[in-house]
Amino acid sequence: MTRTATPAMLTAPTLPQALRNGINAHAAAQLQVDIAPYPGMEEGDLIELFWNNCFAASRRITACRIGQPTRLRIPQSFVLDGPAHVHYQVMQIGHGPARSATTQVRVKTDCPGGQPPAVYSDENQNLAPVGLPETIRRQGVNSRQVHRGVPLTIEPYPNMSSGDAITLRWGDVRMDLPKVTAKGVGLTVQVWVPSSVIIEGGDDCRLEVTYCVLDRVGNNSRWAPTRTLRIAPLLPTRPATATPVYQPRPLG
């Protein structure tokens, strides 16, 4: 006889690959869901997993799995961009189905800069190289600019979104830029490369400058095509000339 009492709600499932409640393209391909052990767990229990209220997977509990977490996989065809609600229910003999609380996540599989065309390349041709003043592009960075710093720009890129984190690479030096804001989406990113970064990068006749983008759920753009610059050696600054002190001529 089936009991009619409503069982207590079970704990929500967890998604170990989620980053800030988001699912990226890599995770979506093999998305896993963990279900914690629950009170009264018995051999023969049937766990059914639901993605946006659609049945996605199930697992029958065996004797050796009692008291252990259960891991299920969501088919990739279910994992579409946008918000998703994940829950499960437990079916036990002689009991009504016990439902869990719901976990909410957001799926984002569109990478910053779009999908790179070459699988085996570290470069994304969908990203524009950094923009620099024409004189710097032609003549390089002179000693005065090394001391002062230089401006550059990053053009808007495909799938640009709020929360994107851009990392500039100046030679072997990396510089993290402020995250893209909602107002900044679709706009050119203005960057000032400070003297400290240029000096640390050192003088070079072919220094490479590039950048990459990591979105809020961990999708990576790969590196933009590089811009090659000549960096002049750092000239020492002139020491300040001491002000002469008046010395009165001795009498006699």
Tell where the protein language model's regions lie, with residue ranges.
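Intrinsically disordered, low-complexity linker/tail regions enriched in polar/charged residues
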Residues: 1-252
